[in-house]
């Protein structure tokens, strides 16, 4: 997860209560895919293809229980609160290296902002039938491979897991135990998630992955089908042949609240990065880009301001007005302003935040 994406939005919070671990819904067949999602102004609080928002929030409670609910300490004066304030100060000063230079700060950021992001991202992913099929491992009888660039803080990871979990048929493990030989008992396909980030989020990723596997997937074969790998690298510097291999064989790439920062810091390198996607991604790979809606997501070229989505479209798709040409990618869906609003009844000890953004979903030609 690259670094300027860390700014916040706003909603409400409540105190810690009972932690429900699991949803009553567990099969994707209960929730048929809408193959023609409409352009909407606001995403639903809970898409039935994901675990409920409270269960997503609860995963962070369980993972970081000691940090969020310290014994014999006032939450307002806890070490976590102090670290959150330090991260806020570093972000305000645009000192992104300092904001994420140790595990304490990275965990503080994850506790403060990732629950809102994970809940929002889950609704975003579930909005697209193409992405649901990938995350549920329902494409071409093969494993699904997902790359989350700038995904170290866990929002994408937990959102993907909230959909993957509901797609698992947990009756298969009982069939195996009873030696039942039927169609239900065949080997499940794997969801392979690669997270790449310029900061070292390995501790956060390991903690969240362990909780996902123990509390949502219950270990055994279902947990073995959910594979997570973290790479500590700057995506703009991944130019060597061994680095470029990461783009081959992918079904989905996500760039969530990352592109604006890339272009703000290094325009030329960012253009080359997107061009590497043009050259190395296989046909059929999907690319999802989310970014803040409004003037924040503008870049300046030759003293002129352009919406960042205009530049991205041009690099990936080409001149959209020229119907006679085909670019490296085709635009599947777009929206220049859409909201995800948190349910104010959600139980979390830190304020949760709404999200207004634009999105682009592309597919590789």
UniProtKB/Swiss-Prot annotation:
Top-level taxonomy: Eukaryota, Fungi, Dikarya, Ascomycota, Saccharomycotina
Keyword rRNA processing: yes
Keywords: Cytoplasm, Methyltransferase, Nucleus, rRNA processing, S-adenosyl-L-methionine, Transferase
Location of the protein in the cell: Cytoplasm; Nucleus
Catalytic activity annotation: uridine(2843) in 25S rRNA + S-adenosyl-L-methionine = N(3)-methyluridine(2843) in 25S rRNA + S-adenosyl-L-homocysteine + H(+)
Family in the record: Belongs to the class I-like SAM-binding methyltransferase superfamily.
Molecular-function annotations in GO: rRNA (uridine-N3-)-methyltransferase activity; S-adenosylmethionine-dependent methyltransferase activity
Effect of residue 294 to R: Abolishes methyltransferase activity
Predominant localisation class: cytoplasm
Cytoplasm keyword on record: yes
Organism of provenance: Saccharomyces cerevisiae (strain ATCC 204508 / S288c)
Domain of life: Eukaryota
EC id: 2.1.1.312
Biological role stated in the UniProt entry: S-adenosyl-L-methionine-dependent methyltransferase that specifically methylates the N(3) position of uridine 2843 (m3U2843) in 25S rRNA.
Protein name: 25S rRNA (uridine(2843)-N(3))-methyltransferase
GO cellular component terms, A-Z: cytoplasm; nucleus
GO process terms (BP): rRNA base methylation
Coiled-coil residue windows: none
